[in-house]
UniProtKB/Swiss-Prot annotation:
GO terms for molecular function: small ribosomal subunit rRNA binding; structural constituent of ribosome. InterPro entries: Ribosomal_bS6, Ribosomal_bS6_sf, Ribosomal_S6_plastid/chlpt, Transl_elong_EF1B/ribsomal_bS6. GO terms for cellular component: cytosolic small ribosomal subunit. This is Small ribosomal subunit protein bS6. Residues 96-132 are annotated as: Disordered. One of its GO terms (biological process) is translation. Binds together with bS18 to 16S ribosomal RNA. It comes from Cereibacter sphaeroides (strain ATCC 17023 / DSM 158 / JCM 6121 / CCUG 31486 / LMG 2827 / NBRC 12203 / NCIMB 8253 / ATH 2.4.1.). Residues 105-132 have a biased composition (Basic and acidic residues). The keyword rRNA-binding applies.
Amino acid sequence: MSLYEHVFIARQDLSNAQAEGLIEHFSTVLADNGGKVVDREYWGVKTMAYKINKNRKGHYAFLKSDAPSAAVQEMERLMRLHDDVMRVLTIKVDKHAEGPSIQMQKRDERERGDRGDRSDRGDRGDRGGFRR
């Protein structure tokens, strides 16, 4: 079996529970066809660079799988037929990266709120710039 990574974007008007339900549904499709989902991540609602089907935002999901190509093709076919899924990207990888994806790492940094490169600065009043 081969290793794959999948990203799909679902419509913005779905609830978080419905978006997570889509992840579960497509994981089941892979399992039913002889594959398995190694890891899954829900990245949340993100703003897209351009509109897709009149949607400016979408629910992003990421799956890592170990599956035969037939299982992946079936899952992609069902994703493309599903009305709630707007875009699908599947890539074949040599090995899965350990730990959370880059998107989840960025999300964790934002939630912490600390900007390590800016901790030495005070309020705006102490900046040197031009004064009248």
